[in-house]
Amino acid sequence: MTQSATAHYFVESPSTGALVLGAVGVVFGDIGTSPLYALKECFSKEHGIAFSPDAVLGVISILFWAMIIVVSIKYVVFVMRADNDGEGGVLALMALVLRTVAQRSRKAKILMMLGIFGACMFYGDAVITPAISVLSAVEGLEIAAPQLSQFVIPITLVILAALFLIQRHGTAAVGKLFGPIMTTWFVALGALGILNLVQAPEILKSINPYYAISFLVEHALQAFIVLGSVFLVLTGAEALYVDMGHFGARPIRIGWFVLVMPCLILNYFGQGAMLLHNPAGVENPFFLMVPELLQLPMVLLATSATVIASQAVISGAFSLTSQAIQLGFVPRMRVLYTSAAEIGQIYLPVVNWLLLVLVIGVVISFKKSENLAAAYGIAVTTTMVITTFLAAVCMRNVWKWDPALVAVLGTSFLLVDLAFFAANLLKIAEGGWFPLLLGSAAFFMLMTWYSGRKLLRARSLEDGIPLEPFIAGLLAHPPHRVEGTAVFLTGSIDTVPVSLLHNLKHNRVLHERVVFLTFVTRDIPYVDDDQRVSCKDLGGGAFILKSEYGFKETPDVQKVLDLADRKLGMHFELMETSFFIARESVIPSRLPGMPMWRESLFAWMHQNGAKPSDFFQIPANRVVELGTKVEI
């Protein structure tokens, strides 16, 4: 096994059973905690649906078929086939389909912007999921221990704050418990469902799609509004695709079809049966279906499950941001590894604290899970619509499927997604504006950074001196040579690094060995170590060293030098090597490019990004930073 192959979730290849257990603990947390609030929200008084046995049968029928069509058929059967070297998620899918279109074409730009916008919507989900999940679980105290009702929000805030505070220490130790806890959770969901099903088995009639269609036709507009709440059972479906690289498609499919889907369906049918038997249970169908003696233990188990679901979303936000950094859409940030065994476990302090502030603010502002339910959904449906569109492009361009088949599948899935999307649009005024605003702000920042970097590269190429002719001329009339190795980090091997020009201008020396090191991010998640480094000898002790990384990897200078030693015979003595880095100060100008205010925003982002020496993990005492100003 190569070193890069270990960059998946586990360093050693575990058995399928272990992967299934791991997937149950991580992948299904979000969708697995939806029973806490989904059905309760479907019968919210604001929807204007008169409570009746037929309404219960209709809503349960819609829930059932939505789960079958969107999760089981669309995601598990079709979308999970679209892997980028084993990785899933909207960014991996975007990178996959971009290979099939001409670079810099209008089509490529549209696909790229769709992928980035879909990814940005995830940040809205990353704020809402921990808040609504933990809050809805702790609200069980209102049923199990009414005297503690006033402490619901404080307890929620303490749990969430603790969750974010432990992120810097990693979750490797407690992560081993995630699988068993979530397995217990799903078994409990199924058992509760069966317990209530036997009291009103007529709820099983909901399997017939007639009841779903009849409900939609009879209630028309009100039923359309209810679709926005029905969608809550599907939140977390995207996680099945996103986490595919951690566990593999097969373990996720086994976990879904063997354990998760049956238990979720049993629980939703059980909640429906309880409502047929006890209509007053509509106040909180989930906790009122639990026998009184077990209500408090169930609150504790539900809280554990929602914390695990929140952890999965937080880890997803770290992973997504790390990918966006490598793809050039986000400024460099400190990326810390929290586990020596599980390379996928990373921690980004900036993202963590920003999420903490937003999540705490959301809980304090919205106060109840039913209020948060209105804000939930719009961001997820947006990502789902984009994933469906990109998957259709993949079917046609990558898999070369028949256009008629692609049209039928793509249109069918898109119509279902758009119905849920339109229903969620009705919730914008009630709170849906928040994740939309958050996602749109993130998209604007990412595109500003991407456009600014393009401008910066263009200016550097315009003003730059071709590297190879310059080195040839320099070696013909060399300055004083000094012992040791100089490594010049550069974004382009076509032009002379500004740091070299400044070194020659001020120090008037050239090291006996000069290495121009550049990092290239490819459109695949991982690069094999055998293909990671390549070298070009320019003569006279000057070399171009190119290191390639996947978009799920973080560059590490020390590892690159070790690899160059092993693979290319280029030995580096760290204490005799100096690393020269140009620290660019961006100056907004009226040159053609972006508006001045947007260039100022880019300059601020550039200034506040992590130092290259920190990001590339270069020993601080071996770094020489040389400042330069660049107008854009």
Swiss-Prot record:
This is Probable potassium transport system protein Kup 3. Transport of potassium into the cell. Likely operates as a K(+):H(+) symporter. It comes from Cupriavidus necator (strain ATCC 17699 / DSM 428 / KCTC 22496 / NCIMB 10442 / H16 / Stanier 337) (Ralstonia eutropha). Belongs to the HAK/KUP transporter (TC 2.A.72) family. It is a multi-pass membrane protein. GO terms for cellular component: plasma membrane. The chain crosses the membrane at residues 19-39, 59-79, 110-130, 146-166, 178-198, 213-233, 256-276, 298-318, 346-366, 373-393, 403-423, 428-448. InterPro entries: K+_transporter, K_trans_C, K_trans_N, Kup. The gene is kup3.
